């Protein structure tokens, strides 16, 4: 089985693009219990790659698609929604569903890159993380997943026999 861990970036002071000290501290604490990862991918925004680095992992690739999803998708899926809310929006089709399909393609390519028993880390953003997660596991009980992902929270996706088979929600207690 292969594992892809998708997490939202750590804490920043809005409207800034960079992590604040609290965000660096949180990412360091979370990172102490993570890994190892064969591949680390983030969005192109500083707070995403800073989170990976603060967690203790070098970034192998940055992907623009994971940086933002634009106004059309924001209208369909305004931040923040619960995981079930994002799943409902994606099921309706439209721009959010097309975007989520692109995320699934990235995660599928990443899973195919990994050897069996290995793992990868993805750091992106609120809304992006949830839409990708619900689309990787469209038949999961998204209500049980709870609310949107707070900083450094996310999901651990398990890949087996050419598909995502289960997800473990990753919550952080501060």
Task: Please state what every model-predicted region is.
Residues 10-13, 46-47, 126-129, 136, ...:
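Short, solvent-exposed loop/turn segments at secondary-structure junctions
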Residues 65-78, 116-118, 134-174:
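Acidic, low-complexity terminal tails and accessory targeting/binding regions
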């Amino acid at each position: 089985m292969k594992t892809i861990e998708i997490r939202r970036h750590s804490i920043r002071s809005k409207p800034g693009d960079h992590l604040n000290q609290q965000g660096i501290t949180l990412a360091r604490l979370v990172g102490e219990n993570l890994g190892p990862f064969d591949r680390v991918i983030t969005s192109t925004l500083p707070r995403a790659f800073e989170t990976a680095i603060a967690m203790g992992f070098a970034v192998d690739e940055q992907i623009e698609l994971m940086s933002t999803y634009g106004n059309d998708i924001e209208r369909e899926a305004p931040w923040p929604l619960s995981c079930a809310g994002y799943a409902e929006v994606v099921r309706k089709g439209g721009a959010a569903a097309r975007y989520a399909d692109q995320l699934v393609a990235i995660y599928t390519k990443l899973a195919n890159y990994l050897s069996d028993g290995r793992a990868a880390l993805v750091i992106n953003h609120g809304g992006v993380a949830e839409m990708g997660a619900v689309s990787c596991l469209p038949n999961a009980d998204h209500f049980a997943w709870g609310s949107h992902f707070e900083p450094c929270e996310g999901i651990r996706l398990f890949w087996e026999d050419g598909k995502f088979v289960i997800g473990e929600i990753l919550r952080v207690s501060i």
